[in-house]
Amino acid sequence: MYTKAIYPGTFDPVTNGHLDIIKRACKMFDKIIVAVADNKDKKTMFSLEKRVELMKKATSHLPKIEVESFNSLLVDFAREKECKIIIRGLRAVSDFEYELQMGYANKSLDSEIDTIYLMPNLENAFISSSVVRSILKYNGDVSHLIPNEIIKDL
């Protein structure tokens, strides 16, 4: 059976933690749609186009990956892509509460969509895009936090 999943996020910017989740999801599914969100509620450091470009570069070596942007409800995007599985990453208990609420909200909007939660490997558990942005703001070195493929682009 052919299976595909959506891994949504703002990815501002993509981190090694995101890439860790993507690589592990590739072992579980035939296709992963990395859905870069155009979230008007978030003030992003990078434009939507740049975030899509960075994600494409970071995942170019992974054949199961398709990168797209979206600006709708996630469940609507999932329906459009005929996808019934959403992947989310959990770094800490603080992520769990928010992700659980979002998972239930998505389920209430479409009962056929399930959310799968993956934890990153321990060495990536502390990495977040907001940490990377904070370091970048002060011209710090983030090379150990982001995929090698995008270092020159930041």
From Swiss-Prot:
<feature type="binding site">
    <location>
        <position position="88"/>
    </location>
    <ligand>
        <name>substrate</name>
    </ligand>
</feature>
<dbReference type="GO" id="GO:0005737">
    <property type="term" value="C:cytoplasm"/>
</dbReference>
<feature type="binding site">
    <location>
        <begin position="89"/>
        <end position="91"/>
    </location>
    <ligand>
        <name>ATP</name>
    </ligand>
</feature>
<feature type="binding site">
    <location>
        <begin position="124"/>
        <end position="130"/>
    </location>
    <ligand>
        <name>ATP</name>
    </ligand>
</feature>
<feature type="binding site">
    <location>
        <position position="99"/>
    </location>
    <ligand>
        <name>ATP</name>
    </ligand>
</feature>
<feature type="binding site">
    <location>
        <position position="74"/>
    </location>
    <ligand>
        <name>substrate</name>
    </ligand>
</feature>
<dbReference type="InterPro" id="IPR004821">
    <property type="entry name" value="Cyt_trans-like"/>
</dbReference>
<feature type="binding site">
    <location>
        <begin position="10"/>
        <end position="11"/>
    </location>
    <ligand>
        <name>ATP</name>
    </ligand>
</feature>
<feature type="site" description="Transition state stabilizer">
    <location>
        <position position="18"/>
    </location>
</feature>
<keyword id="KW-0460">Magnesium</keyword>
<keyword id="KW-0067">ATP-binding</keyword>
<keyword id="KW-0547">Nucleotide-binding</keyword>
<comment type="function">
    <text>Reversibly transfers an adenylyl group from ATP to 4'-phosphopantetheine, yielding dephospho-CoA (dPCoA) and pyrophosphate.</text>
</comment>
<comment type="subunit">
    <text>Homohexamer.</text>
</comment>
<dbReference type="Pfam" id="PF01467">
    <property type="entry name" value="CTP_transf_like"/>
</dbReference>
<keyword id="KW-0963">Cytoplasm</keyword>
<feature type="binding site">
    <location>
        <position position="18"/>
    </location>
    <ligand>
        <name>ATP</name>
    </ligand>
</feature>
<feature type="binding site">
    <location>
        <position position="42"/>
    </location>
    <ligand>
        <name>substrate</name>
    </ligand>
</feature>
<comment type="similarity">
    <text>Belongs to the bacterial CoaD family.</text>
</comment>
<dbReference type="InterPro" id="IPR014729">
    <property type="entry name" value="Rossmann-like_a/b/a_fold"/>
</dbReference>
<keyword id="KW-0548">Nucleotidyltransferase</keyword>
<protein>
    <recommendedName>
        <fullName>Phosphopantetheine adenylyltransferase</fullName>
        <ecNumber>2.7.7.3</ecNumber>
    </recommendedName>
</protein>
<keyword id="KW-0808">Transferase</keyword>
<dbReference type="GO" id="GO:0015937">
    <property type="term" value="P:coenzyme A biosynthetic process"/>
</dbReference>
<dbReference type="GO" id="GO:0004595">
    <property type="term" value="F:pantetheine-phosphate adenylyltransferase activity"/>
</dbReference>
<keyword id="KW-0173">Coenzyme A biosynthesis</keyword>
<comment type="pathway">
    <text>Cofactor biosynthesis; coenzyme A biosynthesis; CoA from (R)-pantothenate: step 4/5.</text>
</comment>
<dbReference type="InterPro" id="IPR001980">
    <property type="entry name" value="PPAT"/>
</dbReference>
<feature type="binding site">
    <location>
        <position position="10"/>
    </location>
    <ligand>
        <name>substrate</name>
    </ligand>
</feature>
<dbReference type="GO" id="GO:0005524">
    <property type="term" value="F:ATP binding"/>
</dbReference>
